[in-house]
Amino acid sequence: MTIIEVKIKKLENFLGNLPEYATEHSAGMDLVAANEQSITIKVGSIQLIPTGIAIALPESFEAQIRPRSGLAVKHGITVANSPGTIDADYRGEIKVLLINLGNKDFIIEKGMRIAQMIIAKYERVLWAETSILTETMRGRGGFGSTGL
């Protein structure tokens, strides 16, 4: 496993908890809500939740913002644009777009763990335009074509 150094800036609304891995083999780090007051996410609605941090990722890395499984299974709270992407050249506050798919309103309290962040390396592509693609067994089959 490779460990990279990522610069992190604590913003004015920072609550004192840097993102951290919960276990030795956790892929994601928990992000906490840095809201001044409680935020209610009504059923079917979306709220943008601040985290109080900004980061400077190295070139060729991104941060992916993903749901916390416990919030999703217990309350129907998930990340609306999952996975949210934080690009290497973004320097603003990381915010999490949460949606309530549950059956009752949900309150986000200050300091609550709201999402997880995964740092991932990515590759850029150079398109090679062609009129013919190589054949595969699957072909054009999609959306359930391989079975349930």
Curated annotation (Swiss-Prot):
What is the name of this protein?
A: Deoxyuridine 5'-triphosphate nucleotidohydrolase
| MF terms (GO), sorted A to Z | dUTP diphosphatase activity; magnesium ion binding
Q: What does this protein do?
A: This enzyme is involved in nucleotide metabolism: it produces dUMP, the immediate precursor of thymidine nucleotides and it decreases the intracellular concentration of dUTP so that uracil cannot be incorporated into DNA.
Q: Where does substrate bind?
A: 68-70, 81, 85-87, 95
> Where does the secretion signal sit in this chain?
none
Record's catalysed reaction(s):
dUTP + H2O = dUMP + diphosphate + H(+)
Copy the pathway line from the protein's UniProt record.
Answer: Pyrimidine metabolism; dUMP biosynthesis; dUMP from dCTP (dUTP route): step 2/2
UniProt-listed Gene3D superfamilies: 2.70.40.10
Stored CDD domains = trimeric_dUTPase (cd07557)
Q: What class of enzyme is it?
A: hydrolase
Provide the alphabetized UniProt keywords.
Answer: Hydrolase, Magnesium, Metal-binding, Nucleotide metabolism
Q: Which family does it belong to?
A: Belongs to the dUTPase family.
Parts forming coiled coils? none
